[in-house]
From Swiss-Prot:
Keywords: Hydrolase. Its EC number is 3.1.3.-. This is Uncharacterized protein sll0400. InterPro entries: His_Pase_superF_clade-1, His_PPase_superfam, Mito_Ser/Thr_phosphatase, SixA. GO terms for cellular component: cytoplasm. It comes from Synechocystis sp. (strain ATCC 27184 / PCC 6803 / Kazusa). It is an enzyme of class 3 (hydrolase). Belongs to the SixA phosphatase family. The keyword Hydrolase applies. The lineage of its organism: Bacteria, Bacillati, Cyanobacteriota, Cyanophyceae, Synechococcales. It holds the Pfam family His_Phos_1. One of its GO terms (molecular function) is protein histidine phosphatase activity. GO terms for biological process: protein modification process. Signal peptide: none annotated.
Amino acid sequence: MELYLIRHGIAQEQSPDIPDGDRQLTKKGKDKTQRVAQRLQAIGVEFDLILTSPLVRAQQTAQILMDQGLAPQLETFSSLAPGEDIPQGINDLKEEYRHRSHRCLALVGHQPDLANWAEYLTFGSPQGKLIVKKAGIIGLTLPSWDCPPGEGQLFLLTPPRWLV
């Protein structure tokens, strides 16, 4: 089982005029995310499914990946919203998707949450050490859906500049 944890692209700055959940990707964010998606396609990455945070900037990032043909399906997964409980989110993921035939999933979300997911799956608990740049990617291999925390293996940690 492979998981690609993908942080949303560059978004509008935080502002009292725009609720956080409504912040959109900037033109630069869309362009960079598009180039990352093109590079993933060029190296043969294919997802069975893209799961995304409900926030607009993550939804837009996921849609760019879809439009590039990296997955046949996209679903909103509320456990990827910022600040959600990491162990509960991973349990929700396992419960919802373990019985499907998916072998490669993309999870589009936010920092520090995605880094915490990666650390929980590879080290058993969040360590606060990994950082995912905007439009950056962490790739993990899990031995099975039922593996305990700490059993995952990190195979990719790349900022977007290495992909564009």
